[in-house]
Regions:
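Solvent-exposed, well-ordered amphipathic alpha-helical segments
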Residues: 23, 59, 276-278
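Signal peptide processing junction and immediate N-terminal pro/mature segment
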Residues: 18-31
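Bacterial N-terminal signal peptides
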Residues: 8-18
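Active-site-adjacent loops and short helices of periplasmic peptidoglycan-processing enzymes
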Residues: 28, 32, 36-201, 205-214, ...
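Bacterial N-terminal signal peptides that target proteins for export
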Residues: 1-9
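Domain-terminus/edge residues, biased toward the C-terminal soluble/receptor-binding domains
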Residues: 181-185, 194-299
Length: 299
């Protein structure tokens, strides 16, 4: 009886030991499964990083100006555009057309012009350092209109045109049609009125046309000039900081800025990028440095 009971106990123990045993192959499999379970959090971290890498690879040009055109002037290829057909007030960009009309008339550049009461801005009340009675040559008036965006200088140029200011504005619109500007209308030679309108696409044509006038290229990119006004020297500076700063690294052939409250800030240029002439039009830029920042992003 004792032997039978002992034998049964030994068999039971052996049976339990067999059920709980693990072969070497089974142990290895179990360890691999455990390792996989521990590796899962690492794989999730790697997946979260992938979208960030894709965003960094994006080469889209993000510009803040409301309407933009960047065009290769040689081929005519539009390299970038944004709202290029939107018709907007163009402020002092107008003065490029003013200069072309003056030069097309082939009037004597050395002729003395006088700032009159009719040249004072009664629309916006802008200030000027050219007092009524100031006398300067036609070329100096052109310089101040293009470089320093002097409104009285631009107005005086129109009043000293054959037929007066009305004939001058008519000539501006005739010139616009002649160079293929479909969205462009002029009502004054300064750009102070919001009735002077154009599109970024049209302005690429206007800047390109202006670039064929050597004097416009010279005067619009003059950094600064001191003139005798009323018997005392006054320093005038270019309104485009990229022209004034050699450290900017820009090679600019034509430049004009503009601003009116209704339409923000503007910048148009013909510049050399990668050894090619490129026309840049930036319209409706509201930040203080937005147009300059956009130009540098394009570069």
């Amino acid at each position: 009886k004792f032997k039978l009971t002992t034998l049964l106990a030994i068999c039971a123990a052996l049976s339990l030991g067999t059920l709980g045993a693990t072969t070497p192959a089974e142990a290895a499999t179990s360890n691999k499964q455990a390792a996989k379970r521990k590796a899962k959090p690492v794989s999730k971290v790697e997946k979260r990083s992938e979208p960030r890498a894709e965003a960094q690879d994006s080469d889209d040009l993000l510009l803040k100006s409301a309407a933009v055109v960047v065009q290769d002037q040689s081929s005519g290829e539009v390299l970038f555009e944004k709202n290029s057909d939107a018709v907007l007030p163009i402020a002092s960009i107008t003065k490029l057309m003013t200069a072309m009309v003056v030069l097309d008339a082939q009037l004597p550049l050395t002729e003395t012009l006088t700032i009159g009461g009719e040249d004072v801005d009664t629309l916006k009340g802008t200030r000027s350092r050219l007092k009524v009675g100031t006398q300067l040559s036609r070329e100096d008036m052109l310089l101040l209109a293009l470089m320093a965006s002097e409104n009285r200088a631009a107005s005086a140029l129109s009043h000293h045109y054959p037929g007066g200011a009305a004939a001058f504005i008519e000539a501006m619109n005739h010139k616009a049609a002649a160079i293929g500007l479909k969205d462009t209308r002029f009502s004054d030679p300064t750009g102070l009125t919001a009735a002077n309108v154009s599109s970024a696409r049209d302005l690429t044509k206007m800047v390109s046309a202006a670039s064929h006038y050597p004097l416009i290229r010279e005067l619009s990119t003059t950094s600064e000039r001191t003139m005798l006004v009323g018997g005392r020297p006054i320093a005038f500076h270019n309104t485009n900081t990229l022209v004034r700063s050699p450290a900017s690294g820009w090679e600019i052939a034509v430049s004009k800025t503009g601003y009116i409250r209704e339409a923000g800030k503007f910048l148009v240029m013909q510049a050399w990028l990668n050894n090619k002439p490129v026309v840049i039009v930036l319209l409706d830029s509201w930040g203080r440095l937005t147009r300059i920042g956009d130009a540098n992003r394009i570069k």
